[in-house]
Amino acid sequence: MGIKPTYIKKIGIELLEFHEEKFTNDFDENKKAVASATNVPSKRVRNRVAGYITRKINTGKFKK
């Protein structure tokens, strides 16, 4: 889908650092986790953050 905006990456990385145990390699579960861990007002931003987190976990590119 292209390069993600900086604000999506920033939110995703912060969530992974502070709430890593909530996230898995399943997009639908990550959507719920993002909704519970943040107060993101729009569904589109929530889904983009969840997709970014899922992609990071599946590719193994997230490091503590």
From Swiss-Prot:
Domain of life of the source: Archaea
GO molecular function: structural constituent of ribosome
Entry-linked Gene3D superfamilies: Ribosomal protein S17e-like
Keywords of this entry: Ribonucleoprotein, Ribosomal protein
Disulfide-bond pairs as recorded: none
SUPFAM superfamilies: Rps17e-like
GO cellular component assignments: cytosol; ribonucleoprotein complex; ribosome
Family note: Belongs to the eukaryotic ribosomal protein eS17 family.
The name this protein goes by in its record: Small ribosomal subunit protein eS17
Organism expressing this protein natively: Methanospirillum hungatei JF-1 (strain ATCC 27890 / DSM 864 / NBRC 100397 / JF-1)
